[in-house]
């Protein structure tokens, strides 16, 4: 889950000072659980919002053996895969913080 535990103040200040961009996500299909069910959860998350940015975890759980299935189902359901991000997922852009960035900073 996203929240104030995500970034320390020092990390956030560094991102801004060095003019980095920080991208978050708006969909978590719980793929780390390692079962095939994450694919359907991810499809449901995509269907439930206009622009979905899913975080997937490259962990040794076996979940990524279903990645091809997930990508095929996205295509079969008419979803587009893009390399740009929903504006609400960019909390820092080229060092400039979004007005909601503070809610992700601890301390």
Give residue ranges: language-model regions.
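A short C-terminal boundary segment appended to hydrolase-like catalytic domains
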Residues: 96-107
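Catalytic domains of cell-wall/extracellular-matrix polysaccharide-remodeling enzymes
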Residues: 1-90, 94-98
């Amino acid at each position: 889950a996203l929240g104030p535990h995500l970034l320390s103040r020092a990390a956030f200040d560094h991102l801004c000072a060095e003019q980095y961009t920080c991208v978050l996500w708006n969909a978590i299909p719980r793929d780390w659980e390692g079962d095939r069910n994450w694919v359907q959860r991810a499809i449901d998350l995509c269907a439930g919002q206009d622009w979905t940015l899913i975080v997937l975890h490259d962990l040794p759980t076996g979940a990524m053996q279903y990645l091809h299935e997930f990508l095929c189902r996205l295509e079969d359901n008419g979803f587009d895969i893009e390399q740009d991000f929903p504006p609400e997922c960019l909390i820092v852009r080229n060092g400039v913080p979004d007005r909601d960035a503070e809610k992700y900073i601890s301390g």
